Amino acid sequence: MSNPVTKSPNSDQSISLLLNELKTVNGHFLIVADENWDSVNWVDFLNHSSCNVSIISNRYDIAQKAETASISTYFNDLDFSGFKPKSFDGIFFRVSKERANTHHVINQSAYLLKPGATLMLSGEKNDGIKSYVKKACMLFNTSSIPTKFGNQYLAKINISEPNNSKKLDDSNYPSMQAVKVLSEYGLTSKPGVFGWNKIDRGSAFFVDHLPTLMSRFKQSPRTLLDLGCGYGFLCYQAKFFDIKNITATDNNAAALIAVEANFKHSECNVEIVASDVGDVITKHFDTIWCNPPFHKGFIIDNDLTYRFLEATCRLLAPNGHAFYVVNSFIPLERKAHGLFSSIQLAADNGSFKVIALSNA
Protein backbone atom coordinates (compact mmCIF):
# COMPACT_ATOMS: atom_id res chain seq x y z
CA MET A 1 0.00 0.00 0.00
CA SER A 2 2.86 2.36 -0.64
CA ASN A 3 1.58 3.65 -3.97
CA PRO A 4 1.73 7.46 -4.27
CA VAL A 5 -1.53 9.33 -4.73
CA THR A 6 -2.14 10.28 -8.35
CA LYS A 7 -3.50 13.82 -8.21
CA SER A 8 -5.82 15.53 -10.66
CA PRO A 9 -7.51 18.95 -10.50
CA ASN A 10 -10.48 19.08 -8.10
CA SER A 11 -10.15 15.36 -7.38
CA ASP A 12 -10.86 13.71 -4.06
CA GLN A 13 -7.49 12.31 -3.03
CA SER A 14 -9.10 9.59 -0.91
CA ILE A 15 -10.56 8.24 -4.15
CA SER A 16 -7.19 8.52 -5.89
CA LEU A 17 -5.82 6.15 -3.24
CA LEU A 18 -8.46 3.56 -4.12
CA LEU A 19 -7.93 3.96 -7.87
CA ASN A 20 -4.19 3.48 -7.46
CA GLU A 21 -4.82 0.25 -5.54
CA LEU A 22 -7.18 -0.99 -8.24
CA LYS A 23 -4.40 -0.65 -10.81
CA THR A 24 -2.36 -3.28 -8.94
CA VAL A 25 -4.91 -6.07 -8.37
CA ASN A 26 -6.54 -8.86 -10.34
CA GLY A 27 -9.97 -10.37 -9.78
CA HIS A 28 -13.58 -9.19 -9.64
CA PHE A 29 -14.06 -5.97 -7.69
CA LEU A 30 -16.97 -3.70 -6.82
CA ILE A 31 -16.64 0.06 -6.57
CA VAL A 32 -19.31 1.78 -4.49
CA ALA A 33 -19.34 5.22 -6.11
CA ASP A 34 -21.35 8.02 -4.55
CA GLU A 35 -21.15 11.75 -5.31
CA ASN A 36 -17.52 11.88 -4.19
CA TRP A 37 -16.50 10.09 -7.41
CA ASP A 38 -17.61 12.93 -9.67
CA SER A 39 -14.18 13.84 -11.06
CA VAL A 40 -13.06 10.31 -12.01
CA ASN A 41 -12.13 9.72 -15.65
CA TRP A 42 -13.42 6.18 -16.05
CA VAL A 43 -11.94 5.68 -19.53
CA ASP A 44 -8.49 6.60 -18.22
CA PHE A 45 -9.00 4.27 -15.25
CA LEU A 46 -9.80 1.34 -17.55
CA ASN A 47 -6.67 2.02 -19.59
CA HIS A 48 -4.54 1.52 -16.47
CA SER A 49 -6.37 -1.37 -14.80
CA SER A 50 -6.57 -5.04 -15.72
CA CYS A 51 -9.12 -6.18 -13.12
CA ASN A 52 -12.80 -6.90 -13.69
CA VAL A 53 -14.74 -4.00 -12.18
CA SER A 54 -18.42 -3.41 -11.52
CA ILE A 55 -19.79 -0.13 -10.20
CA ILE A 56 -22.84 0.54 -8.08
CA SER A 57 -23.79 4.19 -7.66
CA ASN A 58 -26.63 6.05 -6.03
CA ARG A 59 -25.92 9.07 -8.23
CA TYR A 60 -27.36 9.27 -11.74
CA ASP A 61 -24.52 11.40 -13.15
CA ILE A 62 -21.80 9.12 -11.79
CA ALA A 63 -23.56 6.04 -13.15
CA GLN A 64 -23.97 7.63 -16.58
CA LYS A 65 -20.27 8.48 -16.81
CA ALA A 66 -19.23 4.96 -15.83
CA GLU A 67 -21.74 3.38 -18.21
CA THR A 68 -20.48 5.55 -21.06
CA ALA A 69 -17.02 4.09 -20.39
CA SER A 70 -18.53 0.60 -20.91
CA ILE A 71 -18.18 -0.41 -17.26
CA SER A 72 -20.80 -2.74 -15.80
CA THR A 73 -22.82 -0.18 -13.84
CA TYR A 74 -25.84 -0.29 -11.54
CA PHE A 75 -27.75 2.88 -10.64
CA ASN A 76 -29.90 2.40 -7.56
CA ASP A 77 -30.20 3.28 -3.88
CA LEU A 78 -27.23 1.11 -2.88
CA ASP A 79 -29.39 -1.99 -3.31
CA PHE A 80 -26.94 -4.88 -3.48
CA SER A 81 -29.56 -7.63 -3.74
CA GLY A 82 -28.99 -7.99 -7.49
CA PHE A 83 -25.48 -9.35 -6.91
CA LYS A 84 -24.77 -12.98 -6.15
CA PRO A 85 -23.64 -13.64 -2.57
CA LYS A 86 -19.89 -13.82 -2.01
CA SER A 87 -19.13 -12.89 -5.61
CA PHE A 88 -16.44 -10.21 -5.22
CA ASP A 89 -12.74 -10.37 -4.40
CA GLY A 90 -12.88 -6.86 -3.02
CA ILE A 91 -15.04 -3.80 -2.43
CA PHE A 92 -13.59 -0.30 -2.78
CA PHE A 93 -15.41 2.48 -0.93
CA ARG A 94 -14.54 6.05 -0.04
CA VAL A 95 -16.52 6.65 3.16
CA SER A 96 -19.63 8.74 2.63
CA LYS A 97 -20.62 12.06 4.10
CA GLU A 98 -23.69 10.31 5.52
CA ARG A 99 -23.03 7.85 8.37
CA ALA A 100 -26.01 5.63 7.52
CA ASN A 101 -24.71 5.16 3.96
CA THR A 102 -21.28 4.10 5.16
CA HIS A 103 -22.67 1.72 7.78
CA HIS A 104 -24.99 0.21 5.16
CA VAL A 105 -22.13 -0.45 2.73
CA ILE A 106 -19.93 -2.02 5.41
CA ASN A 107 -22.78 -4.27 6.55
CA GLN A 108 -23.57 -5.34 2.99
CA SER A 109 -19.95 -6.21 2.29
CA ALA A 110 -20.45 -9.27 4.51
CA TYR A 111 -22.99 -10.52 1.96
CA LEU A 112 -21.00 -9.57 -1.14
CA LEU A 113 -17.40 -10.57 -0.42
CA LYS A 114 -15.81 -13.99 -0.83
CA PRO A 115 -14.15 -15.53 2.25
CA GLY A 116 -10.76 -13.92 2.67
CA ALA A 117 -11.65 -11.06 0.32
CA THR A 118 -10.84 -7.43 1.03
CA LEU A 119 -12.83 -4.38 2.01
CA MET A 120 -10.87 -1.24 1.08
CA LEU A 121 -11.91 1.95 2.85
CA SER A 122 -10.49 5.43 2.39
CA GLY A 123 -11.19 8.90 3.76
CA GLU A 124 -9.82 11.69 5.90
CA LYS A 125 -9.62 11.73 9.69
CA ASN A 126 -12.44 14.27 9.94
CA ASP A 127 -14.61 12.00 7.77
CA GLY A 128 -14.58 9.41 10.55
CA ILE A 129 -12.41 6.93 8.65
CA LYS A 130 -10.67 5.57 11.76
CA SER A 131 -13.97 4.96 13.52
CA TYR A 132 -15.43 3.21 10.46
CA VAL A 133 -12.38 0.96 10.15
CA LYS A 134 -12.63 0.05 13.84
CA LYS A 135 -16.33 -0.83 13.50
CA ALA A 136 -15.72 -2.87 10.34
CA CYS A 137 -12.95 -4.80 12.08
CA MET A 138 -15.29 -5.59 14.98
CA LEU A 139 -17.90 -6.85 12.51
CA PHE A 140 -15.41 -9.16 10.81
CA ASN A 141 -13.40 -10.20 13.89
CA THR A 142 -10.18 -8.85 12.41
CA SER A 143 -7.78 -5.95 12.74
CA SER A 144 -6.49 -3.28 10.38
CA ILE A 145 -4.44 -0.14 10.89
CA PRO A 146 -5.21 2.58 8.32
CA THR A 147 -2.16 3.82 6.41
CA LYS A 148 -1.74 7.60 6.28
CA PHE A 149 -1.04 9.41 3.00
CA GLY A 150 -0.94 13.14 3.72
CA ASN A 151 -4.42 13.97 5.00
CA GLN A 152 -5.90 10.73 3.66
CA TYR A 153 -6.09 7.25 5.12
CA LEU A 154 -6.39 3.88 3.38
CA ALA A 155 -7.41 0.69 5.18
CA LYS A 156 -7.34 -2.89 3.93
CA ILE A 157 -9.71 -5.12 5.90
CA ASN A 158 -9.50 -8.85 5.27
CA ILE A 159 -12.92 -10.42 5.57
CA SER A 160 -13.82 -13.35 7.80
CA GLU A 161 -17.18 -14.69 8.97
CA PRO A 162 -19.07 -11.66 10.33
CA ASN A 163 -20.26 -11.32 13.90
CA ASN A 164 -23.88 -10.30 13.26
CA SER A 165 -24.20 -8.87 16.75
CA LYS A 166 -21.66 -6.24 15.67
CA LYS A 167 -23.56 -5.01 12.63
CA LEU A 168 -23.38 -1.26 12.26
CA ASP A 169 -26.43 0.92 12.84
CA ASP A 170 -27.54 1.92 9.32
CA SER A 171 -30.79 3.61 10.48
CA ASN A 172 -32.72 0.85 8.68
CA TYR A 173 -31.30 2.18 5.44
CA PRO A 174 -33.54 0.49 2.83
CA SER A 175 -36.85 1.53 4.42
CA MET A 176 -39.13 4.51 3.99
CA GLN A 177 -39.73 5.88 7.47
CA ALA A 178 -42.13 8.14 9.28
CA VAL A 179 -40.26 11.16 10.59
CA LYS A 180 -41.94 13.05 13.43
CA VAL A 181 -41.11 16.51 12.13
CA LEU A 182 -42.54 15.61 8.70
CA SER A 183 -45.70 13.89 9.94
CA GLU A 184 -47.80 17.06 9.95
CA TYR A 185 -47.14 17.32 6.22
CA GLY A 186 -47.95 13.66 5.61
CA LEU A 187 -44.42 13.05 4.36
CA THR A 188 -42.02 10.17 4.88
CA SER A 189 -38.33 9.88 4.10
CA LYS A 190 -35.37 7.52 4.23
CA PRO A 191 -31.64 7.42 4.89
CA GLY A 192 -29.61 8.32 1.82
CA VAL A 193 -31.57 11.52 1.17
CA PHE A 194 -29.78 14.71 2.21
CA GLY A 195 -31.31 15.86 5.50
CA TRP A 196 -33.65 12.88 5.37
CA ASN A 197 -34.97 13.17 8.93
CA LYS A 198 -35.52 16.91 9.15
CA ILE A 199 -36.93 19.91 7.33
CA ASP A 200 -34.15 21.91 5.72
CA ARG A 201 -34.14 25.41 7.20
CA GLY A 202 -33.69 27.00 3.79
CA SER A 203 -36.61 25.05 2.38
CA ALA A 204 -38.79 26.06 5.34
CA PHE A 205 -37.88 29.71 4.73
CA PHE A 206 -38.78 29.27 1.05
CA VAL A 207 -42.18 27.77 1.88
CA ASP A 208 -42.96 30.61 4.29
CA HIS A 209 -42.62 33.03 1.37
CA LEU A 210 -44.39 30.96 -1.29
CA PRO A 211 -47.72 32.84 -1.05
CA THR A 212 -45.96 36.12 -1.80
CA LEU A 213 -43.86 34.56 -4.54
CA MET A 214 -46.85 32.97 -6.23
CA SER A 215 -48.68 36.31 -6.30
CA ARG A 216 -46.38 37.23 -9.19
CA PHE A 217 -48.52 35.05 -11.45
CA LYS A 218 -51.59 36.59 -13.08
CA GLN A 219 -52.95 33.07 -13.51
CA SER A 220 -52.11 30.05 -11.41
CA PRO A 221 -49.24 28.12 -13.03
CA ARG A 222 -50.16 24.74 -14.47
CA THR A 223 -46.71 23.12 -14.46
CA LEU A 224 -43.99 22.95 -11.82
CA LEU A 225 -40.44 21.61 -11.90
CA ASP A 226 -38.78 20.86 -8.56
CA LEU A 227 -35.11 20.88 -9.59
CA GLY A 228 -33.23 18.80 -7.02
CA CYS A 229 -36.35 17.56 -5.25
CA GLY A 230 -34.97 15.56 -2.32
CA TYR A 231 -37.84 13.76 -0.59
CA GLY A 232 -40.29 16.29 -2.08
CA PHE A 233 -40.80 18.90 0.63
CA LEU A 234 -40.95 21.82 -1.82
CA CYS A 235 -43.06 20.30 -4.57
CA TYR A 236 -45.45 18.86 -1.97
CA GLN A 237 -46.55 22.47 -1.39
CA ALA A 238 -47.87 22.68 -4.97
CA LYS A 239 -51.26 21.38 -3.85
CA PHE A 240 -51.84 24.62 -1.94
CA PHE A 241 -51.53 26.58 -5.18
CA ASP A 242 -53.64 24.35 -7.41
CA ILE A 243 -50.67 23.20 -9.50
CA LYS A 244 -51.73 19.88 -11.01
CA ASN A 245 -48.70 18.92 -13.12
CA ILE A 246 -45.46 18.36 -11.24
CA THR A 247 -42.08 17.12 -12.41
CA ALA A 248 -39.65 16.21 -9.62
CA THR A 249 -36.05 15.45 -10.51
CA ASP A 250 -32.89 14.55 -8.63
CA ASN A 251 -29.64 12.68 -9.27
CA ASN A 252 -29.92 10.79 -5.97
CA ALA A 253 -31.64 7.40 -6.20
CA ALA A 254 -32.79 7.58 -2.57
CA ALA A 255 -34.49 10.93 -3.21
CA LEU A 256 -36.34 9.53 -6.22
CA ILE A 257 -37.64 6.62 -4.14
CA ALA A 258 -38.74 8.97 -1.35
CA VAL A 259 -40.52 11.51 -3.55
CA GLU A 260 -42.29 8.70 -5.39
CA ALA A 261 -43.56 7.33 -2.08
CA ASN A 262 -44.74 10.76 -0.97
CA PHE A 263 -46.77 11.33 -4.13
CA LYS A 264 -48.09 7.78 -4.43
CA HIS A 265 -51.65 8.81 -3.56
CA SER A 266 -51.52 12.34 -4.94
CA GLU A 267 -54.28 13.65 -7.17
CA CYS A 268 -51.68 15.60 -9.13
CA ASN A 269 -50.03 14.39 -12.31
CA VAL A 270 -46.51 13.72 -11.04
CA GLU A 271 -43.52 12.71 -13.16
CA ILE A 272 -40.36 11.64 -11.35
CA VAL A 273 -37.15 11.86 -13.37
CA ALA A 274 -33.58 10.79 -12.69
CA SER A 275 -31.32 13.47 -14.14
CA ASP A 276 -28.07 15.35 -13.84
CA VAL A 277 -29.37 18.86 -13.08
CA GLY A 278 -32.35 18.29 -15.38
CA ASP A 279 -30.22 17.29 -18.37
CA VAL A 280 -32.73 14.79 -19.79
CA ILE A 281 -35.76 17.09 -19.40
CA THR A 282 -36.87 19.00 -22.51
CA LYS A 283 -40.28 20.52 -21.81
CA HIS A 284 -40.85 23.97 -20.33
CA PHE A 285 -42.43 24.85 -16.99
CA ASP A 286 -44.50 27.75 -15.74
CA THR A 287 -42.60 27.75 -12.48
CA ILE A 288 -39.38 26.15 -11.22
CA TRP A 289 -38.54 25.78 -7.54
CA CYS A 290 -35.04 25.02 -6.39
CA ASN A 291 -32.92 24.70 -3.26
CA PRO A 292 -29.63 23.83 -4.99
CA PRO A 293 -26.70 22.09 -3.31
CA PHE A 294 -23.25 23.63 -3.33
CA HIS A 295 -21.35 20.53 -2.15
CA LYS A 296 -20.53 17.31 -3.93
CA GLY A 297 -19.73 14.94 -1.13
CA PHE A 298 -17.06 16.57 1.03
CA ILE A 299 -16.00 19.07 -1.65
CA ILE A 300 -17.49 22.51 -2.35
CA ASP A 301 -18.41 22.74 -6.05
CA ASN A 302 -18.33 26.39 -7.10
CA ASP A 303 -19.81 25.59 -10.53
CA LEU A 304 -22.84 23.70 -9.27
CA THR A 305 -25.07 26.71 -8.63
CA TYR A 306 -24.44 28.04 -12.13
CA ARG A 307 -25.33 24.66 -13.65
CA PHE A 308 -28.68 24.77 -11.87
CA LEU A 309 -29.27 28.31 -13.11
CA GLU A 310 -28.41 27.33 -16.69
CA ALA A 311 -30.88 24.45 -16.51
CA THR A 312 -33.53 26.77 -15.10
CA CYS A 313 -32.99 29.26 -17.92
CA ARG A 314 -33.39 26.46 -20.48
CA LEU A 315 -36.48 24.90 -18.92
CA LEU A 316 -38.45 27.95 -17.75
CA ALA A 317 -41.41 28.95 -19.93
CA PRO A 318 -41.16 32.44 -21.55
CA ASN A 319 -43.61 33.98 -19.08
CA GLY A 320 -42.60 31.77 -16.18
CA HIS A 321 -41.11 32.55 -12.79
CA ALA A 322 -38.39 30.58 -11.01
CA PHE A 323 -37.78 30.77 -7.28
CA TYR A 324 -34.52 29.81 -5.56
CA VAL A 325 -33.49 29.59 -1.93
CA VAL A 326 -29.78 29.57 -1.09
CA ASN A 327 -27.47 30.39 1.79
CA SER A 328 -27.09 34.15 2.02
CA PHE A 329 -23.37 33.99 1.19
CA ILE A 330 -23.99 32.32 -2.21
CA PRO A 331 -23.62 35.00 -4.95
CA LEU A 332 -26.61 33.69 -6.88
CA GLU A 333 -27.60 37.11 -8.22
CA ARG A 334 -24.19 37.53 -9.83
CA LYS A 335 -24.22 34.01 -11.23
CA ALA A 336 -27.71 34.55 -12.68
CA HIS A 337 -26.64 37.73 -14.49
CA GLY A 338 -26.87 37.22 -18.25
CA LEU A 339 -29.28 34.30 -17.91
CA PHE A 340 -32.35 36.18 -16.68
CA SER A 341 -33.74 39.63 -17.41
CA SER A 342 -35.27 39.91 -13.94
CA ILE A 343 -33.32 38.94 -10.81
CA GLN A 344 -34.99 40.05 -7.59
CA LEU A 345 -34.22 39.45 -3.94
CA ALA A 346 -37.57 38.42 -2.49
CA ALA A 347 -36.52 37.67 1.10
CA ASP A 348 -33.40 37.45 3.26
CA ASN A 349 -33.21 36.46 6.92
CA GLY A 350 -29.44 36.69 7.22
CA SER A 351 -28.97 32.94 6.87
CA PHE A 352 -30.95 32.26 3.69
CA LYS A 353 -32.27 34.32 0.83
CA VAL A 354 -35.02 33.74 -1.72
CA ILE A 355 -34.42 34.95 -5.27
CA ALA A 356 -37.09 35.37 -7.96
CA LEU A 357 -35.95 34.90 -11.57
CA SER A 358 -37.73 35.41 -14.86
CA ASN A 359 -37.34 36.39 -18.50
CA ALA A 360 -40.90 37.69 -18.77
Can you annotate each of these PLM segments?
Residues 8, 150-218:
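SAM-dependent Rossmann-like transferase core, predominantly class I methyltransferases
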Residues 3-72, 201-290:
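Conserved SAM/SAH cofactor-binding pocket of Class I
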Residues 90-100, 227-232, 285-298, 312:
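Conserved proline-anchored active-site loop of SAM-dependent methyltransferases
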Residues 101-178:
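N-terminal auxiliary segments of SAM/dcSAM-dependent transferases
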